[in-house]
Amino acid sequence: MKKILFSILAIAALISCGKDDNNSDAPAYSAEEAKTEVKATMDNFYDCLKKANDGGFANFLYNTITKAPGQNQAWFGKLADQFEDQHQGLFTALDDNKRFDFNSFKGTYTWSNVTNSWTKEANTAKIVLIFPATATSTTNNARAEIDNYQDELVMNQDNENVYLPKKAHLFISVDNAKQLEVTLRNVEYKKLGEGFTPTAIDLAIFTNPFTTTIKLAKKEPTIYTLNFNFSSPQGCATGLAGSIKLTSDNLDSFTSFEEAVEFINVVAFQDKFQVIANVDVKSVHKAGKKIADLEGVDFNTYFKAELYKNNRKVADVKVEEDNRGDSDLFFIFSDGSKQRAESYIEDFEEKVENIFKRFFKD
């Protein structure tokens, strides 16, 4: 069962926008065509990862977390440690109040390669850090800014103040080219147990050259929608649109996932390739079962999924028995033939590590 769940999650992650109407009369792909399309989609996904690894943000990140020759810590570690050493009072207040006090941190901080320290100038509008992008940079060619940060004060169950992020905006540029930008437009929270959980999120993250958007919204008292998109100008587009219906708006009333959820609907995409899936959680609960404990083909009773590309059906996704009598997740093609879904992702970890191998070096 764990292997089946892993296959589902991995496939959704890999083929996570097209929102075309798939209820068309276009003929399904033949089995051979379908296999070719699935493999092409996987190859496209790996190509997108390569573009991410070659992008400006990945290079910036690598340079900041990698130890320079003769250094015992990463470059950003050195900058951060020195900043904290020089401004202990700010960090002590942060720990004491359990709050990031934006106003207290405001200022323009400039790194000196001569003194290996930060200097500060007054700035009542924002936090600015000017520094060398790498340990070998001879100029302060990087700039980080936080020009907006707002939080919300709530009380926890012990009547203690808790400050939750509501809005924020920051960016980092190197040689005047933006490498990272985070825009948190809004977050809404609701009490859940001993803490708080987001019920609405509007977030955009730019990591050169990719833009990621995440939007969580409460459409009705018990219905939430999630939209995730990851794309670049180079043609990579991966995303997910999902909805979930809860059995109650009282988030503290649930004792299990099956009790809390009625259904989950998901459309995941990689360019024009789509996975359309739904899970009838209500029926699982009614039957007195747990999703993680579903055995073999019993999974098909509650889980439905189909693959599409360009409005044409590629395959059904079902749990079937293999030639050894073991249950596994299969793609069922138009001629009735089938292939293990795992066969398309069994080397996933190896390929990802190879693409990002510079980050995995000691």
Predicted regions and their residues:
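Contiguous hydrophobic, core-forming segments of folded domains
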Residues: 31-34, 186, 206-258
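Positively charged n-region of N-terminal signal peptides that target proteins for export
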Residues: 1-4, 18-19
